């Protein structure tokens, strides 16, 4: 028995974008934030399958799960899907909100680099499909990260496998 993000990470490490990397952090962005660790090519889930879970770490006035999931869009009086459609139409306000979201993701990535120093971070989940709209804010935030060599050596990508969690669970 395992959690959905651990299954996603296992699937991505065996069949997707984390394949061939020794150390990876896989993050699902959706109604919440899930994360898992691939260390030395193997899923590391800890004693209770929660190793690497960073969504509940305090951030600003709430936690990372609030600011890096669909919950933050409720506070913006919109939804991720609405913003995705509007951004695709070139709506400046929607693009600005995605940029703001990207800044929060950049802070999350900074935390991941400090804690785990992975070779690759793979995003999955319903919000990952909008990476093209929030990656600018993410990378802009990472410009202030004190160890730029770590940022330069890190690959940040999204999963192209729709059923990575199923593949991971079946492995």
Segments (PLM) and residue ranges:
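ATP-binding/phosphotransfer module of carbohydrate and carboxylate kinases, centering on a glycine-rich
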Residues: 14-21, 58-171
């Amino acid at each position: 028995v395992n959690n959905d993000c651990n299954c996603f990470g296992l699937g991505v490490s065996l069949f997707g974008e984390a394949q061939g990397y020794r150390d990876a952090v896989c993050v699902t962005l959706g109604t919440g934030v899930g994360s898992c660790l691939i260390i030395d090519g193997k899923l590391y889930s800890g004693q209770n399958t929660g190793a690497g879970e960073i969504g509940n770490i305090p951030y600003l006035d709430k936690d990372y799960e609030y600011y890096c999931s669909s919950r933050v869009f409720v506070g913006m009086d919109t939804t991720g899907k609405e913003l995705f459609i509007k951004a695709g139409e070139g709506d400046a306000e929607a693009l600005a909100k995605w940029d703001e979201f990207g800044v929060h993701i950049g802070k999350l990535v900074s935390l991941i680099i400090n804690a785990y120093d992975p070779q690759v971070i793979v995003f999955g989940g319903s919000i990952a499909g909008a990476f093209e709209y929030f990656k600018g804010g993410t990378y802009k935030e990472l410009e202030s990260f004190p160890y730029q060599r770590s940022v330069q050596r890190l690959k940040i990508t999204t999963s192209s496998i729709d059923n990575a969690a199923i593949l991971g669970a079946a492995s």
